[in-house]
Amino acid sequence: NEPWADGSPHPIGQGGFNGGDGITSMHHNAAGTRISPTEIWESRNPWLVKKIELAQNSCGPGEYRGGLGLDLEFEMLEETYVTTVVERTKFPPWGINEGGEGRANNVILNRKNESSNVPKKTGLKLHKGDSLIFKTGGGGGYGKSSLRSNKKILNDLKQGYISIEYAKKHYPQLKV
């Protein structure tokens, strides 16, 4: 096997702000960069991308909701070593002016029908068939969720950004 290395900072949701929802899947990295296409990851690294999707309900509620994080899953195709450096795993992104918290970052290791949370900074020896699941954070909301318009809530539901359960919990003013 050829040596390889990949440094992949994963996108997160930006917090809502006075006047707008947070940006979804924002890449906080060097200017002008973006997340690598799945095909590039798979062609250059010994893993299979099993999932990469917007994380429903990861946004913090508010008049202006936070942006959504991502759910990514990588299955290892051979034995390999991985280093993870993930911040904001214990304390989720806070909301502002009574907005709600977004989802915290989390990394999960699936190994032979066993799941465990990965420490925020660690090195791991992974075996063929092991999967790493990255759940990137969603942004906190801005303003009281009771002030979010019904039109925006319905659009979030239509887009799949939030579930009906999430909407009922955080937006009691919802009229379906």
Where are these regions (language model features)?
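Glycine/proline-enriched, intrinsically flexible loops and inter-domain linkers
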Residues: N1-V176
